[in-house]
Every structure is written in C-alpha cells, then in structure tokens.
Amino acid sequence: MTAHLSGDIEQTAAAERAVAKGENPKRPHVLVAQHSLFDPIRAPEGKHSLWTYCHVPNGSTFDMTDRIETQIERFAPGFRDRILAKSAMSPARLEKYNPNNIGGDISGGVQEMRQLFTRPVPRIVPYSTPLRGLYICSASTPPGGGVHGMCGHHAALAALRRDMRQ
C-alpha cells in the first residue's frame, strides 16, 4: 500500500506545477510505503522501514530529504524523532544505480501505447517473448509504472495461461 501526502488539491497541483516549471517543490506531493509491515525481513525485529519519494524536475540533484520529512511530519507528528537511519538518492544517482531509470524516472520512462505492446518485440501478449518460458514484467510493461504489482500479476497470468495450454 502506498499513501499520498500533500494536502488539498491546490497544494498537490502547486507541487506538480513547480516540477513542470523545472523547480523543486517547497511542499512536495510525497508517496510513502511501509514495506516492513508486509515483509518483516526489511527491518530489524520491532523496527520498520519507510520508503518514500516525490516528483522533482528531470535530472535534479537537489536533496529533497528535509522537504519530504517536513511533509510527513505534517501528517505524522513526531516522525522525525523516530528516524534511526536514512538514505536518499537524486534522479542522477538513481539513473547511475539502474540505467533503466532514465533521468531518474522510476516508472520506466514514457508510457505510450505503441511502446507497451512492442517491448521487446511486437506481441499480442506484451509479457511473452519469442523464447519459450521467458516472460518480462516491470514498469515498462502494461499497465505501466505506478500500478504497483500489476505488471507482475499480469505477466504471471500470461505465463500460466500459455504454459498450461502446452
């Protein structure tokens, strides 16, 4: 589960307008997830991890950590006092870490219909490949980035349907 923190619609729109103008938003629209609630190996016993991000201009090197923490603190007072450790990555560092994150885009790049059904080659079932038993799933397959888990779900169903017929 992912929670979105930004305030009312005007505050959300202002944050996204700033990014569109090439500015780092003062009050970003923040997405947070606490994966350790569902996967206990992500944090020591009795502790939790929090994963978060916000939109910034393409290629930004500005550290948004303080602004993100300030937004979370608005909705969860005392949050900062509970932080034991933190790590942040700029878009440039994200791209260096994973070349698929072009410009730091964690959604796998532009989502265009013609691309979604031609990766890696044109196919009716975009998760299958010409190689038997090889399927792909990621933010670069339908329904695209931001629909957490659905790319893998659909790829698994495609694999089961195809493999069960053979």
Placement of each model-derived feature along the sequence:
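A conserved FAD-binding loop/helix module that cradles the flavin
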Residues: C137-L160
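Mid-domain catalytic core of redox enzymes
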Residues: M1-A43
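Active-site-proximal substrate-binding core of FAD-dependent oxidoreductases
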Residues: P91-A92, L160-Q166
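Flavin-binding catalytic cores
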Residues: Q11-H29, S60-P99
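Short glycine/proline-enriched loop/turn "hinge" motifs that connect secondary-structure elements
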Residues: P40-K47, V125-T129
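A glycine-rich dinucleotide-binding beta-alpha-beta segment and adjacent secondary-structure elements
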Residues: R27-L31, G78-P142
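A generic structural motif
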Residues: V56-T61, S140-P143
